[in-house]
Amino acid sequence: MKGLRSAFSFFTIIPIKSELDEHLIAYVPLVALFDAALAASLYVAIYGISKLLASFISVSAIYIVNGLNHVDAVADAGDAMMIRNRSRIREVFEDHDVGAGGVFTLIFVYLLALISLSSMDLYIGIFSIILAEFLSKSMMMITLHRSRPLFQGIGSLFIDLYRKHDSLYTVEFVVIPIVLALLSRASIMISVALAFLIFIIVKMAVIRRFGGINGDLAGFIGELGRSIFLMISLIMAQSSVLSTYDILSKIMSSL
């Protein structure tokens, strides 16, 4: 229970007093479940009024319940990507001011998620919200897998915690989104696979660019992963990919 309390205390704004427990990473999927349930509920409740408003409230709720920590991470990563001199990267991450790169990156990531979700029908939207949250948390955590700390801080602490059960954590964060995807349409299953592929490419590019990983970069990759998945999910849904139910129905009717 200490790990669960620690996970909710660290990753959400829920007022739970808890010290940083070494097992909190194992409970991150439960945080994702809470976030996804909240966002999906708001989405369903408001969808009949306005798809755009439902999407805005849903996406914003996740950012807010996470304490806007990842908003800061996306902005810092955006600013850092604009710096050519590696010796100044730490200075940029520790600077509280947000530059043009940070503003653009934050707007891009947020609007990509918002526009993609607001263009979906209700069924696809619900599944996409849920899977996007699990994928976001999974990608953020898997970013720590065999990564070198960029410098000492929260990121290096989490990398050390992840290394203690590296293989188990990686299996956990890969399997959960895949299992959830199998319960949905074929288009969403393909979207999850493509999102993971793009995640691997992005992680490699980030490590090549910065030489390591810190908390902000892990948070940025998680949020970018959410937006990319929602975009892919929309594209796949509109490309008339048959659902698993449709495929089974056609097979049964042909017998």
UniProtKB/Swiss-Prot annotation:
Record GO cellular component, one term: plasma membrane
Originating species: Thermoplasma acidophilum (strain ATCC 25905 / DSM 1728 / JCM 9062 / NBRC 15155 / AMRC-C165)
Predominant localisation class: membrane
Localization in the cell: Cell membrane
UniProt-recorded name of the protein: Adenosylcobinamide-GDP ribazoletransferase
InterPro entries reported for this sequence: CobS
Catalytic reaction list: alpha-ribazole + adenosylcob(III)inamide-GDP = adenosylcob(III)alamin + GMP + H(+); alpha-ribazole 5'-phosphate + adenosylcob(III)inamide-GDP = adenosylcob(III)alamin 5'-phosphate + GMP + H(+)
Transmembrane segments: 24-44, 45-65, 98-118, 122-142, 164-184, 187-207
Major enzyme class: transferase
Stretches of the chain forming a coiled coil according to its record: none
Pathway annotation from the record: Cofactor biosynthesis; adenosylcobalamin biosynthesis; adenosylcobalamin from cob(II)yrinate a,c-diamide: step 7/7
PANTHER family in the record: ADENOSYLCOBINAMIDE-GDP RIBAZOLETRANSFERASE
Obligatory cofactor(s): Mg(2+)
Any one GO biological process: cobalamin biosynthetic process
EC number: 2.7.8.26
